[in-house]
Structures are given as structure tokens and as C-alpha cells.
């Protein structure tokens, strides 16, 4: 780690501690100023826009920032208004913090728009260095023209922010994309820093001895996440295993849709909504299989991501069923930590469940072993070290 003492960290809720990144920052910086920005309306979460001030890992004070409640139907339409508000609040409070603290060493974010705000703060002398940890790429392709326009505009910020003082990528696919379109030279070297895993006790219980097969999902409830694949295969699953449960942790724009699907299904489904802290671990560790079956649509941003949900499943020794749209899918399959399926193959999901449940202990141990490779304390230091 370097000698930096203070950091501004900006992220969208509920991703502030994905891969234990907030924990790492709190462990390594004396003064931490976290801007949590709301994008989706999440049930069970009252405040979306918050500035949290930490000193020596302890929360000192929180400030509620301006909150614009928006129906899920109008999220993308009103992005410009929300973005202007976000811009003004980060600029104002960061400048105020600079006056109080005299020096702010690092501005760190995972979003292209907020990374651009960081470059402005550096230009006016508020912060010393900027770090952009690139989590995603939003293909400017979508059936909704408004969404397509917003993605195009976001991509312009992404190209600018790709020249922050420090740029790291969660996978090589994101870096190669920028090389292919000429943002970087072909021989440019940038660190690949995946989403990290936690080091949790391994408490595997052989799920084959349980009569109920329990699936788990954690994340934002959007149709693109493939949450409904369990409902789509309910009849076959019930015929094969007799009793099926589904634990769903999280909230999001399509939550009502999934709740309706659950009502029409004979599967026992429990929605937990957004859970504070890490209480979701207690829910997930009961589950036999983690769901990460992203729909392979060309407009799905998950093609370029490194989903934190998968790293969470692995940290708990939970085998994963995922689709082959992630770069990380190859590693899941090679390590025997789960099964990768073709989303549109009608038999693939049930066959994958059979395969995992037939050797659940083995798959579970492989998942936990893979998680050790990505322990967050091992992989994050290179992102914050300036040479």
C-alpha cells in the first residue's frame, strides 16, 4: 500500500461493498468519504443518496443527499436530471471536504460518469489522483431508443475517463475492447483486478441429504439477470426432485414481475428484499446452488462484467449455474465450481442441477477453493499503488 491517507469513493447503491471493496478501502485509508448514489429504487432501503464519513474504519457522520424518487418506468428518461444533481453534490461536498481536510489523496470510482467528475475535481485542485476501476461496458444497442441514447452518452464519458491517473479493469475483455477501438495502443499494459472474494468459514453440509433443493440468488432484480430460469423449469424440477425452494435476496425494477411469477409457481419462494450489512450470508449459506444465468442478449451489459454475486457464492462454497456470456464462465467450468449452460437449451438447466446435486460435496469444495484465488486482500493492493 502507498502513503495515501484520504480517499473519496463513489459508487452506486447497492454495490458499494461488492467484492469487499469498501472493506478494503476502510482497512487501508485513514479518512474515507463514501458517496452512495441511488439508481434503482430498492425495497427495504430508505436512503439512496448518502455521504458517509469514516475515520480509522469508524463511521463518524452521514449526510443525506438530495433524493429524487423515480418510478422504474422513468429511470432512464430522467438520468440527465439525476446526473446533474449527482455532479453538483459530489463537486460541492468534495470541495467542502478539501477545505476541512486540506488534502484529499485519491478519488476512486467504478463508473465512467463519476470518474469524469473526478477528473474535474483534480483539474480544480480538490484531489491529487484519480483511479477508475472499470466494471462494465454498456453496448449502445437496445430495443428502447432512450436507453440506447443514454448508453451512447455514457460511452463518451467512458472514453474520457479511460485516461484517469490509474485505470484497472475487472477482466481482460474490457481492456481488449478499448484497444480494438483505438482508445489504447495494442501494447498498452493496464492491471486486471477482478471482483474480490471474502474469506469465510467453510461450513458445507451435504445438500444431497436434504429433501429440498434450495436455489439462491443475490443481486438487483432485473430480467436480464436470468432470475426466472428456476420458474421456467419448475415442472421438470419438481418432477425430478420433489421439493424445490428459492431464496431471493435483493430488489430492483422487475421485482413485482418476479413476485407474480413466484405466485404462479409451486416452488417455495422467499423474497428478502435488500438486506443491510452481510446478513445475506446467513440466507445464502443454506442454498445448494447459486443462480447467475444471465440472458445472452447482445444488449446485456453482463457480457463485459465480473458479477459480484458469483464471487459471493464461491466464498460460501456454493456451486454456480451460469451462462456462457461471462469471461469468468471458463474458469468456473475448468475448476469444477459449477456448470455453464446454454440459456436457450430447454434441458440444460435441469441437467445442470442433476449434475451438481449428484456430486454436490465435490462441486462445493471446488467453489470454495476457487474463491481463495480471488481473496480481496491479495488482489486489490495493485489497484491503489502508483508507480
Which stretches of residues belong to each language-model region?
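Short beta-strand->alpha-helix junction loop in the catalytic core
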Residues: 137-138, 173-174, 190-203, 220, ...
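Conserved donor-binding/catalytic core segment of Leloir-type glycosyltransferases
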Residues: 168, 197, 201, 207-225, ...
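Acidic donor-binding loop of glycosyltransferase active sites
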Residues: 284-303, 318
